[in-house]
Amino acid sequence: MKTKEIPIFLDYSQSAPERELCTDCGISRTTDPKRCGTACQFIHPQYESLEQKIHGKTRTDQGEDALFFGSFRQMYRAKLKNPLPGAQWSGITTSLGEKLLETNQVDAILTMAPDALDPWKPTPILITQSTDMVKARGMRMGYAPLLALLDVAKEKGYKRLGIIGIPCQVYALRALEKELSLEQLF
């Protein structure tokens, strides 16, 4: 049984280094900010090679849907039969995160929670207990340095991570996945 850990929130009151096109995914705030040069989809786009590596095919191999949505293995539309309180789209995404933690498929989930003073401001959080996923309910579609928590995850020895984030965060994490020695990434 895992020991009870409280979620780790990121204090990002310090501004990130100024860069054109930067969405502040958080890589520039890590111990090795130079990784932006290889991880950022704006600085070093490598869509086809990452799609091939992750999905076994590229978006150009998949037809019109993939050209619009990006490469995918399978595509589903789903919602919970009984929506959860405080959830945006029924709570299915946070429920998937809960299940990954409950079944020990991941050590932690990187996601966003509301800021204590501004509920619309996304605050990066690293969650290790399924019961804490409730803190991440509700969609906060804004830029925040989620990946700055990768240093904390590494310090804690987390090798299996789930991520609930926006495309530029997921892209950067996938680009660094091998370098980070992750065993599993959901």
Predicted regions and their residues:
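Iron-sulfur-associated redox domains of electron-transfer enzymes in respiratory
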Residues: E48-F186
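Iron-sulfur cluster-binding cysteine motifs and their immediate structural context
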Residues: M1-T58
